[in-house]
Amino acid sequence: IKLFIQQRCKCLAWNIQSDKIINMSLKIILIMGLPGAGKTTLANELVKKIKAKRLNADEVRKVANDWDFSEEGRKRQAKRMSDFALKLKNEGNNVIADFICPTPEARKLFPADYIVWVDTIKSGRFDDTNKMFVKPEKFDFHVTSQNAKEWSERILTDLSKNV
């Protein structure tokens, strides 16, 4: 898996820089929530404001060719995302990862330094995910409506307080 990560990291993570970049200690930021809640949209906005590499769960699944959404498959995906995120952080990058991370067990496998819960919909696009999803007890920031530009600014402010 280590070789796979080294070969694939460069095509799965990308940089977007802006004039609003803040200085902070290296962080792995997890943006989690139900499918269709706005995780990817928020991640795309936030990565414009923070010098970071971005990991999208769907892209990682595509490269791994692993479309198993069972509980075991989701744990495997969380571990895979964890491996990518840690490698990128160890290379000196902030990391923004967006994925469902539906269960406490999956969340324990992912080493987030800062967790954003995107809680904008009552149910997602997939019944099996809705049934499996457990609302997180622990998070650093709670997004309650779909306005990625506004929420990314609020998250940036919160992150700058916790530098």
Label the predicted regions.
Residues 31:
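Hydrophobic anchor at the beta1->P-loop junction of P-loop NTPases
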Residues 43-83:
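Conserved substrate/cofactor phosphate-moiety recognition/catalytic segment
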Residues 39:
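Conserved lysine of the Walker
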Residues 72-123:
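Glycine-rich phosphate-binding loop used to anchor ATP phosphates in small-molecule kinases
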Residues 35:
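The conserved Walker
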Residues 109, 118-163:
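Small-molecule kinase domains that catalyze NTP-dependent phosphoryl transfer to phosphate-bearing small molecules
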